[in-house]
Amino acid sequence: MPRKSVQEREKKRLRLINKYFLRRSLLRKCVVDLKVSSEERWNAVLKLQTLPRDSSPSRLRNRCGRTGRPHAFLRKFGLSRMKVREAAMKGEIPGLRKSSW
């Protein structure tokens, strides 16, 4: 398991992402929209820069649900590759089995 501080940091980032999601998406739409005047677009860029850095979804790291491992994460299962293999060998994942040919 990762350190407690790492887990809490990820939880905090997730809360901030959810809190600022709507505001951030509206500002991004304004920045991309060419119909809006350049001054308004520039103001939207400045407002976007004032939002907390951790409110950006790209700052969130996918982690294994059982071990907290950040690498070799499989989105489909929410687990790392080792835990997917263990679960598959135990038959805990329906429809998944070791290939053989």
Curated annotation (Swiss-Prot):
It comes from the Bacteria. Pfam families: Ribosomal_S14. One of its GO terms (cellular component) is cytoplasm. GO terms for molecular function: rRNA binding; structural constituent of ribosome. Transmembrane segments: none annotated. One of its GO terms (biological process) is translation. Keywords: Ribonucleoprotein, Ribosomal protein, RNA-binding, rRNA-binding. InterPro entries: Ribosomal_uS14, Ribosomal_uS14_bac/plastid, Ribosomal_uS14_CS. Belongs to the universal ribosomal protein uS14 family. Binds 16S rRNA, required for the assembly of 30S particles and may also be responsible for determining the conformation of the 16S rRNA at the A site. NCBIfam families: PRK08881.1 (NF006477). Part of the 30S ribosomal subunit. Contacts proteins S3 and S10. This is Small ribosomal subunit protein uS14. The lineage of its organism: Bacteria, Pseudomonadati, Pseudomonadota, Gammaproteobacteria, Enterobacterales. The gene is rpsN.
